[in-house]
């Protein structure tokens, strides 16, 4: 009997325990929202737009810059954006005047999309700084657009007018594509106008693609100073110094490799195809291809390759510290003014090798008698 009572009491206790204790609460787990749900689309405009955008940039999945007036001496700072951020320029973006080095705009981040809406312009109003000296003296002029440390990103349909000096600085970037970019500095085509208005300066970057660019300027359309796996295709370059490698040497990174420049036109420019390396510097230029390049209205050199640059000017004495190897020119054709030179090659002994030239035809100018150490496959 006692044993039976014990069993009955245990059974009742167990039943009470089951009913007395509540079920454990289920963990409240909220799925991470998608980026477009986590952040908002933010629009900034007017004179306070630049500051507000810079302060709020990490809270917005899409940043719309509508007719922003960037104050003088101020960078439109879009560095450190959240992954996947989209930046859209609308209307006319303007910049206040001050003598300073810039940049006027700076963007960095991963999986970033920067684009211009239809009709949008970034107006540097460079005439306020222009004095014909560029970055070599006179007024201190701000560089325009830093695309530094941009990874797996795109910049498209940006229309830049009248940059004070250099336009795009691409540095420390990987897998960056720029498409449909327009740089229009034609207002600077005067003696006291724009100078050193390079459109695209590339350094220490990998996997850079520039496609469909239209450039009117007074310096290099493209200048690759260092980097690998760089492509420039479908471009129109007018009024400047051509499509250039270099100058290579004298920087922290002095190696250029795997560059393709193709299907592009160079017109009304000082030079067409240009490669320049620095006197007594070290580095390398290898596996560079110029393919299907059309030249017209070239005033100085149709093709110029020199290993003698010092302080931005040729010395006439080439050195071998930056060899140029595996260079291909395929289908480079066009005309040079009668006062210009068709082809000029100045290599140090043994420093230019493994070149392939096919379908190269540049005429109208003079034949140089000052070429040195020209590889057998090329002609000067």
Curated annotation (Swiss-Prot):
Its main location: secreted. The keyword Transmembrane helix does not apply. Pfam families: Glyco_hydro_28 (PF00295). The keyword Cell wall biogenesis/degradation applies. It catalyses: (1,4-alpha-D-galacturonosyl)n+m + H2O = (1,4-alpha-D-galacturonosyl)n + (1,4-alpha-D-galacturonosyl)m. InterPro entries: Glyco_hydro_28, Glycosyl_hydrlase_28, PbH1, Pectin_lyas_fold, Pectin_lyase_fold/virulence. Residues 21-38 form a propeptide. Glycans are attached at residue 287. PbH1 repeats lie at residues 173-204, 205-226, 256-277, 285-307, 319-364. Keywords: Cell wall biogenesis/degradation, Disulfide bond, Glycoprotein, Glycosidase, Hydrolase, Repeat, Secreted, Signal. One of its GO terms (biological process) is cell wall organization. The active site is at 219 (proton donor), 241. It is an enzyme of class 3 (hydrolase). It comes from the Eukaryota. It is found in: Secreted. SMART domains: PbH1. Belongs to the glycosyl hydrolase 28 family. This is Polygalacturonase 2. The gene is PG2.
């Amino acid at each position: 009997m006692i044993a039976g009572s014990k069993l009955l009491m245990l059974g009742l206790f167990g039943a009470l325990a089951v009913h007395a204790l509540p079920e454990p609460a289920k963990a409240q787990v909220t799925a991470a929202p998608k980026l477009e749900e986590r952040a908002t689309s933010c629009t900034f405009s007017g004179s306070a737009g630049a500051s507000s955008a810079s302060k709020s940039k990490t809270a917005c999945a899409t940043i719309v810059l509508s007719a922003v007036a960037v104050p003088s001496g101020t960078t439109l700072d879009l560095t450190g954006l959240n992954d996947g951020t989209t930046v859209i320029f609308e209307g006319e973006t303007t910049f206040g005047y001050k003598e300073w080095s810039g940049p006027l705009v700076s963007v960095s981040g991963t999986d970033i999309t920067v684009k211009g809406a239809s009709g949008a312009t970034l107006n540097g109003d460079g005439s306020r700084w222009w004095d014909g000296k560029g970055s070599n003296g006179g007024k201190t002029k701000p560089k325009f657009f830093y695309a530094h440390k941009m990874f797996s990103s795109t910049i498209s349909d940006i229309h830049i007018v009248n940059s004070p000096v250099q336009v795009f600085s691409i540095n420390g970037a990987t897998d960056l594509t720029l498409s449909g970019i327009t740089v229009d500095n034609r207002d600077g085509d005067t003696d006291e106008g724009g100078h050193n208005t390079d459109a695209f300066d590339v350094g220490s970057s990998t996997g850079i693609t520039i496609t469909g660019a239209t450039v009117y300027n007074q310096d290099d359309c493209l200048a690759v100073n260092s980097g690998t796996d760089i492509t420039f295709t479908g471009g129109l370059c007018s009024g400047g110094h051509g499509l250039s490698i270099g100058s290579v040497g004298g920087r922290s990174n002095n190696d250029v490799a795997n560059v393709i420049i193709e299907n592009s036109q160079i017109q009304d420019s000082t030079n067409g195809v240009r490669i320049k390396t620095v006197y007594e510097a070290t580095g390398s230029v290898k596996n560079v291809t110029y393919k299907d390049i059309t030249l017209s209205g070239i005033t100085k050199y149709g093709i110029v390759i020199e290993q003698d640059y010092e302080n931005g000017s040729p010395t006439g004495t080439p050195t071998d510290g930056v060899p140029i190897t595996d260079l291909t020119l395929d289908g480079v054709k066009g005309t040079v003014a009668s006062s210009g030179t068709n082809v000029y090659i100045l290599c140090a002994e043994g420093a230019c090798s493994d070149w392939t030239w096919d379908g190269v035809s540049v005429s109208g100018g003079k034949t140089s008698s000052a070429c040195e150490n020209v590889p057998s496959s090329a002609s000067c």
